[in-house]
Amino acid sequence: MTSCGQQSLNVLAVLFSLLFSAVLSAHFRVCEPYTDHKGRYHFGFHCPRLSDNKTFILCCHHNNTVFKYCCNETEFQAVMQANLTASSEGYMHNNYTALLGVWIYGFFVLMLLVLDLLYYSAMNYDICKVYLARWGIQGRWMKQDPRRWGNPARAPRPGQRAPQPQPPPGPLPQAPQAVHTLRGDAHSPPLMTFQSSSA
């Protein structure tokens, strides 16, 4: 594997581990959407909210008759009857299908960004080459090879003679060709005028 490929894998591994740890640490901090005892739907939110104290980082709720709210660790352990220090699996949010959907969606968004970058760099090759050279990223892969892009007028390889053009075999039938001149309007038909009414 090349050093560039190994470096890319290392970066992806670090990003994956950071995202995975963030997901595991955030499951207590999310108040998921819920319906109260009157049947009204309440949207979910992330703790702490902008209006909350920064120590209120956990989601508390007593039952369906009381709204969910952000609370501190002591209140969370009293209300939810969960010991955060004893088990890391205590009050884990279990919406695995939504979490899987977020990961799949994130993967496709990342792939779209990579493809967009590759398309942009292919369309703006000269600009990208200048910036990469300015940043110190250069190499043989940056030089355009006319053979790579399917140039019909290929340059001869070293040690080869240039191919000589050959005349066409025999006379070719001549098709009648129309001759157009721009000198005058002698041969062009007159323009027709149409009456138009404005409505």
From Swiss-Prot:
- Give yes or no: UniProt keyword rRNA-binding: no
Asked whether the keyword Transmembrane helix is assigned, the reply is: yes
Q: Which Pfam families match?
A: Shisa_N
Where does the protein end up? Membrane
Which residues does the annotation flag as glycosylated?
53, 95
Regions of compositional bias (Pro residues) in chain numbering: 164-174
What is the membrane topology noted in the UniProt record heading this document?
Single-pass type I membrane protein
Q: Where is this region: Disordered?
A: 146-199
Spell out the Low complexity composition-biased ranges. Answer: 152-163
Residues spanning the signal sequence: 1-25
Q: Where are the Cytoplasmic topological domains?
A: 119-199
Source organism, top-level taxon: Eukaryota
Membrane-spanning regions, if any? Answer: 98-118
Topological domains (Extracellular): residue ranges? 26-97
Q: One Gene Ontology cellular component annotation?
A: membrane
Keywords attached to this Swiss-Prot or TrEMBL record, sorted alphabetically, are: Glycoprotein, Membrane, Signal, Transmembrane, Transmembrane helix
Give the family this protein belongs to, as stated in its UniProt record. Belongs to the shisa family.
Q: By what name is this protein known?
A: Protein shisa-like-1
Instruction: Record the organism.
Output: Homo sapiens (Human)
